[in-house]
Amino acid sequence: MGGGLMAEPNPEELVDLGVESYKAKDYIQAKKYFEKACGLNNGGGCGALGDLYDDGKSVEKNLIKAAQLYTKACELKEGVGCKRLWSLYYYGRGVEKNLIKAAQYASKACDLNNGSGCGVLGFLYGSGKGVEKNLIKAAYFYSKACDLNNGGGCGNLGVLYQKGEVVEKNLIKAAYLYSKACELKDGLGCKDLGTLYYNGKGVEKDLTKAAYLYSKACELKERLGCSALAVLYINGQGVEKNLTKADQYISKACKLGDQEACEVLKEK
């Protein structure tokens, strides 16, 4: 072929170009790439386009359109699209709230090895939402989620080991799972591991480590991490006593929705 014509980018390349455009805040160009990829039946393109309509950054927010695009993505075996549909049906955003459908989409996401989908499915079985409550199944899906590097799945499995629910109580295993959750940037996992270090359960008692983990949890926007760290600053445990810092962490906990922290602030 003469004329130096470049080959048309394939659907995967179109998605990559769209992501690059999105990162560069060129949302209009990103939308064009995603539309083209989705038109070529690329699930990732449809899912990414759905995200644009979901967050309303580059196009007018349209949850109905987002739901349609996520549905197409899911049908094209794009796990993230199925997981997004779980969220829409669970919260009733852009579609009528339907917990049974939410569970079905979480299950499909998990079948497609989407770790977040498996974690959500574990939560649904653990709470009996959209499916019959079954802690054995919850543990199974948390375990699969954790194997797929979903921090929430590791953390929730850790809780079952700490409590001895449907698995034999094992605090060392719980500590390991919280540690993995924390490494995967799950704030609650960091907080729960911090509490084990604070109490010396499953690990050797270490208040400095507890403070570090509560701090990490707080950075990851886990309100209970912020309030736990505030208590350490008040008591001078694992950190130097500092009431100003304690107040800052109580304030952050309140902003993140910790009602007890808000009550403490009101009393000041």
Question: Where do the language-model regions lie?
Answer:
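Hydrophobic face of amphipathic alpha-helices that form TPR/SEL1-like repeat modules
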Residues: 14-21, 48-55, 84-91, 120-127, ...
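Alpha-helical segment of the N-proximal tetratricopeptide repeat
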Residues: 9-36, 51
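Short helix-capping/linker turns of helical repeat alpha-solenoids
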Residues: 9-10, 21-22, 39-43, 55-57, ...
